[in-house]
Amino acid sequence: MIKEISPAEVQEKLQNGENIELIDVREDEEVAEGIISKAKHIKMGDIPARAGELDKEKEYIFICRSGRRSENVAAFLQEQGYKVVNMTGGMLEWKGETVPKQ
């Protein structure tokens, strides 16, 4: 079972200054339209090769367009022993600010 969080809950955590780890797994052209400012971009296809960059002691919130790809990534990483949360509804439901990808 994958833990879930709503976009509104993520926005609230950011507004409260909580130190949360966000990973956006969308493709480059999707992220070019805007990304949550604190999110790190790792494309879904790159996750297996880049999982070593993640700390198993931290909890990561995964984001995609609708919540489906991020759920798959979260399930994959949970099996590897990572602490994961899926942002349900994805960027389609995100009402907060986005910034251009750096």
Model region roles, listed by residue range:
Residues 1-20, 27-59, 68-102:
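Rhodanese-like catalytic fold shared by cysteine-dependent sulfurtransferases
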Residues 63:
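Short, surface-exposed ligand- or partner-binding patches at beta-edge/loop junctions that are enriched
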